[in-house]
Amino acid sequence: MKLERLLAMVVLLISKKQVQAAELAELFEVSVRTIYRDIETINRAGIPIVTSQGSGGGIGIMETYRLEREWLKEEELFAIASALQSVSSMYEPVSHSTAYQKIKHLIPEQSTQAFKHQTEKWFIDMTAWGHTEDQKTLREKISAAIDRLLTISFTYTSASGETLLRETEPYTLVCKAGHWYLYAYCLVRNDFRFFKLNRMKDLAILHQTFIRKDIQLDTLPWDKSWYQKDRLTELVILVQPSARQRIGEWFGYDVLHCCEEDEICQAVISLPEDQWLIGFLLQFGKDIEVLQPLHIRDKVKETIHHMQKIYET
C-alpha cells in the first residue's frame, strides 16, 4: 500500500543521510518515477526532502530538519527494540515484527553494532515449556475480539473442577509467570474476572458489541483473585536439603531457617488454602513435611493414602 511505503520511506530517510532513488525503487519494488512522486507527496506533508547530484548524492531529509526529528535517544530505541523482541516470544502479530524492523532502521549506521549488542543482552521467553500452536491461535482470536469490541463465549473449567458456559466482554490479555489469562467482564457473574486460557474450550466470537468500561491496568491488583490475605494459611514445613533450592525459589531464601548446609530446615510459608494447595505440596514428594496446621497435614496424609490405594490395585 502507498501509505505504508511512504511511512517506511520516511523512517528509512530518518536513519540515513542520503539514499539513491534507484536503491529506494529496488527496496520497495516500484519504479524510480514512482519514488519521485512519493517524494513530492512527503514534501507536501511538511517533511522537507532534498535531492543532490553527483557522487555520494541522493535523496535525504533537509539537515536543518534533523534536530527536530531526533526525539528518541539511541538508548531509548534499544529499549523499545528489546521490548518488542520479548513480546514477540509470547505474541507474534505481524505489526510487532514490522515495528521492530522500523526501529532497527532508525539506528544510525555507526551504531549498528551497539544496537546488536544491546538487543542481544537480554532474551526473555515467557512461553510455557512445550507450548502448542493452539494456545497461540486462542490468544490471537481473543485479541481480535478485543480490537473489535465483540463479546466472546467459551466453556470454562475452574480450579475446583466446575464447568460453566461463560459469556464475557474481553478487555486484556495478561501474561503472568509464564501463564496466559484473560481479564474480562463476565456477563454471567456481572463482574470482572480472570480466566486462565488453558482452561477454556470452544471459544466463539459473538456478533454482539460492547462499550468498553474505563479501567486502569497499572492499579489493578493482579494477584487479588488468588492471593488474598483472608484466604492465606500459614504453614510450618520441614525442608530436606534436596528441596531447599526449590523452596527458596518459590518463597525467598529468608524463609528457610537452617543451622548447617546439610541439615533439614524449617520454613514458614503462606499460601491460599484451596484445592490447588495439596497438589502444590505433594509435588515436593518426600522432600518436605507439613507440621502445621494439623488439618492441612491430615489432608496431605489422606491424599497420599488414596494415591497408595490406587497404585496397589
Curated annotation (Swiss-Prot):
Keywords: Cytoplasm, DNA-binding, Repressor, Transcription, Transcription regulation. Transmembrane segments: none annotated. Residues 2-57 form the HTH deoR-type domain. Residues 131-210 form the WYL domain. This is Uncharacterized HTH-type transcriptional regulator YobV. PANTHER family: PTHR34580, WYL DOMAIN-CONTAINING PROTEIN (PTHR34580:SF8). Pfam families: HTH_11 (PF08279), WYL (PF13280). The gene is yobV. It is found in: Cytoplasm. Residues 19-38 bind DNA. Its main location: cytoplasm. GO terms for cellular component: cytoplasm. One of its GO terms (molecular function) is DNA binding. It comes from the Bacteria. PROSITE patterns: HTH_DEOR_2, WYL.
